[in-house]
Amino acid sequence: MKKLLIAAMLFAAPIGLSTASAADYKIDVEGMHAAINFKVKHVGISWLTGRFDKFDGSFTFDENDPSASKVIVDVDVSSVNSNHQKRDEHIQDPGYLNTEANPSAHFESTSVEVTSDDTGIIHGNLTLNGVTKPFDLHASFVGMGDDPWGGYRSAFEATAVIHPEDFDYKFKYGDVYLELYIEGVRQ
């Protein structure tokens, strides 16, 4: 009986040790395993797509209680890249992104609302063009696991819509649609 109890404890020990809890992650911008893309109507007719090349951030993901997770992302708005240098310079002007006066954007979550096993709404505050407003990211869990370099990663994707007038932008091309692809390395 004693041997059976010891065997049962040894078998159960690894399971207990692997129980997931909150973990901190750094967004992998070095390996380009993350992206912030956008699309907006080009003169109200077709889609103009692009991305922000410079951003950084971190998140805490609690696998057992995703509602306790947290996200912080900082974006260098002047790193806007629409694959056309002259247009990118124009987009940075005061009439558009106003990057000289407000070169960065900041998002910080305030809560996470779990909507299904692998989706949720990340509620937070977005500071853009010097204006801070409540802002939601509609997120989906993509996956997690060991990487080939001895680390551990978690990945998510999210969408959001920016209403330019909410952030004192004057351009009239409609809403800006964001797609975020985030892979983090556990710290």
What are these language model-derived features?
Residues K3-I6, D24-Y25:
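Short, basic/polar N-terminal leader/transit segment immediately after the initiator methionine
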Residues I6-A7, G184:
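Conserved short hydrophobic patches within well-ordered secondary structure
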Residues A7-G16:
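Bacterial N-terminal signal peptides
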Residues A20-Q187:
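Low-complexity, acidic/polar, glycine-enriched regions of mature
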